[in-house]
Amino acid sequence: MKSIFLSLSLLASATVGVLAAEELGIDVTVPVECDRKTRKGDKINVHYRGTLQSNGQQFDASYDRGTPFSFKLGGGQVIKGWDEGLVDMCIGEKRTLTVPPSYGYGQRSIGPIPAGSTLIFETELIGIDGVPKPESIVYKQAAEKAEEAASAVEEKVAEATDKAGGKIADATKKVEEKAEEASANVVEKVASVVSGAAEAVKTVVADTDDVQEHNEL
């Protein structure tokens, strides 16, 4: 019974591995911000470079020809991996597609591509027919870095402000303490002077009384 469960477990693991290997991989290598993304039915212009996952050998590249490839997205004019992997893409965006046989050429041998091959496509969306090209391409990474930099500056300013506020508070407290100390010293000195003056007056009065008593005698 244990061996049966073990066999079933291994079979399930192998099935999961096969299903994972058959999934279309979409890696956005250069993300871009835009309002109008590709959708099925668009005629798009794409630059690409295709290689075999097994050995990295290049089998085709529009970059080498200097002309992007044009086709109707979702119209079945290209392999399934492209029809599904290039949807919701911005002009200027780059993606790397990992295309398993079920999304590529299956078990057919096509030119330099052996049967059952997993293909790697480096793609770049050059344009969408009928959609004006943006005057400038806003790269997400640059925007995110700018936001991070601005956030970091704000944090530094807040930190510096807190430190400065603390130092000012400390300095104010020290000034107040010194002022209180100086005031106390002044009061003490004034009291001492007043006390001395009072003693002097007492002495003068006492001397005057002595003189009067002597004259009366």
UniProtKB/Swiss-Prot annotation:
Q: Function of this protein?
A: PPIases accelerate the folding of proteins. It catalyzes the cis-trans isomerization of proline imidic peptide bonds in oligopeptides.
Q: Where in the cell is it found?
A: Endoplasmic reticulum lumen
**Member of which family?**
Belongs to the FKBP-type PPIase family.
Recite the UniProt keywords alphabetically. Endoplasmic reticulum, Isomerase, Rotamase, Signal
In which organism is this protein found?
Neurospora crassa (strain ATCC 24698 / 74-OR23-1A / CBS 708.71 / DSM 1257 / FGSC 987)
Query: Could you tell me the EC number(s) of this protein?
Result: 5.2.1.8
User: Which Gene Ontology biological process is one annotated for this entry?
Assistant: chaperone-mediated protein folding
List the Gene3D superfamilies hit by this protein, alphabetically. 3.10.50.40
Q: Which EC class is the enzyme in?
A: isomerase
Tell me if Endoplasmic reticulum is a UniProt keyword of this record.
yes
Xref: InterPro entries? FKBP2/11 (IPR044609), PPIase_dom_sf (IPR046357), PPIase_FKBP_dom (IPR001179)
TM region positions? none
Q: Domain named PPIase FKBP-type: which ranges? A: 41-129
* Catalytic activity line of the entry: [protein]-peptidylproline (omega=180) = [protein]-peptidylproline (omega=0)
Q: Which GO terms describe its cellular component?
A: endoplasmic reticulum; endoplasmic reticulum lumen
Name the chain's protein.
FK506-binding protein 2
What residue stretch is flagged as signal peptide? 1-20
Motif span (Prevents secretion from ER)? 214-217
* Keyword Transit peptide annotated: no
Q: Name one GO molecular function term.
A: peptidyl-prolyl cis-trans isomerase activity
